Amino acid sequence: VGTTADSRQYTLAKLQYLQWCGFCKSSQEVVFLCSPNLLNEKSFRHISPESEHYFRPATWCVQLLCRDIPAAPAFQHEWYLSNIPSQLDAPQEFFNYTSGRWISNEREQLEARRIIFSVEGLKSAAAKVLGVSNSFDMTKLGEGLFNRAFLLSNSDGADVVARLPTSVAGPKRLTTASEVATIKLMAALGIPVPKVFSYSCDAESEVGSEYILMERAKGIPLLSVWAKMGRKRRGQVMTQLVEFDSKLLAMKLSGYGSIYLKQDLPDSCTLPLSSDPSLSDYCLGPSVERSWWAEDRKMISIDRGPCKPFPIKLTEGTELNEILKAKALREIAWIEAYARPRPMDDLFRRSDSQEDPSAHIDLLRKYVTVIPLLTDYVAFPQPTLLHMDLHLGNIFIESAKQPIITAIIDWQGSEVLPLSLAARFPRMIDYDIGEDPVTVDMPPETEDPSAKADREAVMVKKYWLAKTFQLNPHLAAAFQEPVRKHLLSLWTESGRTWTGELAAFRHDLIQFVDICEQCPISFSPEERTRHKEELEEYNNKVVVMNRLREMLGVSLEGWVSPERFDTVSQANEELKRETANDLCNGNGGFRQEWERWWPFSDR
């Protein structure tokens, strides 16, 4: 927009008085053009990294939030009048992420989680589904890094929860469509979930954002009472979770991918979910798992599924090869198109191989070569859907005394995977208790509170495992599959060699090669020596980073609770300064570079 000098001057003048925003019709991204950051960008480039590459004059338009002002005639691109009302009277906490802060790159993190929408449009949508008046009280119910939930309450006692995704939640349209379909499928299977009243995958609706309107989860969050619950009631919760897994594992699914309602996807990119007639409204489509769409990956034409695993026999794992290969080929395509090595004098530069796109591509191609051999070892390729993030906050129960599960929430990002990849402990009990969690000795009895808590955690996990062996033996066996460690590591690391660490992926691949007979690839002694050096350097960095995070009490990206932000920010600056004093020895230039390198510095 604004490709001529005259039109740009006109726009800048009007921006001082109007609520204008730029809108990319392709990516469904919205950004206020009157923000100071954008006014400084003469080209009006969208500053959100997720949408920057969608910016082309032919696909952008400017929408006026003030309806009676015509667009500048000098603009040659498409213009239209927005139906999104001004947000000046709405609480800014509705649109902004307020549940946490970041001690580095906070501006970008907050911008990625800002949701622009029409409050009145959302209330109107809620009124339609409930058949009541539009006079709702609206409060922010909660938010995570990828969603925001609001409670809309009517004076008649009716209420509804509205769930809106952020720009980093996943692919536009598909993420909401898949979440709704998965929730509806869970209800059909008898797994307690909130009822979906209505939804929109279209950000150009009257709400101005994708949304899901659903009933409020019944009961209380398990998180609020778990610490006070005794073994018996904890065991009751675990038994119910294992029984729900049984219902999921009983489905005979036809392939891999994410779940959709047929009405939300064209037939050309779907597979039937199952041969079961009762599931005929559902289908499998592209995976909405975030790594397939992160950064510029959504710009690449790649195979994201669905993938059918039954061309010959399930046990042959023919299409398990394809799902593993697709992720590796995705990274090859992304590296070829977008990976840019840092200059030799850049302090951020890592090892030579890490900064060499060809080294990544060569190693990924080696991995693709051994995928058929890897899948020969896999005993459980059957398509499986399990909850991806079963923590205490996602489970609701009637009460502490009646721990009957009333709702399981947050099915966003769910996908059907081979059982060998899908098998996981519920995150609420995912404690590390050794290589063999079934036969590990219990920690000794002690009066130490921390040790007692560890003992209780081990007992809960062992109880879940015992019930799983009893009711879901294939799931239990998948945890003990000999190749599982290699399969999971290669599956994970093959999707992030450039943004993660090539040495970690190479290490996983070497370990697998060493256990194989007649492997088609090999690593020379010289390659292994260089790898050992790079792996040691990488492991040292991991130790330092983990130690730093532990000292500051932050996440990997620097997230911290709002009440701790000032204290942690000050501690971070002091650590950075003290470390620079110790290492730089008065060298001002190196000190400046070192402080820029510091893990929790703005980039």
Language-model regions: role of each:
Residues 1-59:
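Intrinsically disordered, low-complexity basic segments at termini and long loops, enriched
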Residues 4, 154, 398:
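Acidic surface patches and DE-rich sequence motifs
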Residues 8, 14, 58, 234, ...:
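Short amphipathic alpha-helical segments that mediate assembly, nucleic-acid/protein binding
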Residues 35, 44-223, 227-231, 239, ...:
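Conserved NTP-binding catalytic cores of kinases and kinase-like/nucleotidyltransferase enzymes
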Residues 137-358, 377-385, 403-404:
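ATP-binding pocket architecture of kinase catalytic cores
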Residues 149, 162, 366-421, 599:
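Active-site acidic catalytic loop and adjacent metal/ATP-binding pocket
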Residues 294-376, 520, 545, 552-562, ...:
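Long, low-complexity, polar/charged, intrinsically disordered or flexibly structured peripheral segments
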Residues 385, 398-514, 518-521, 543:
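Active-site Asp-x-Gly
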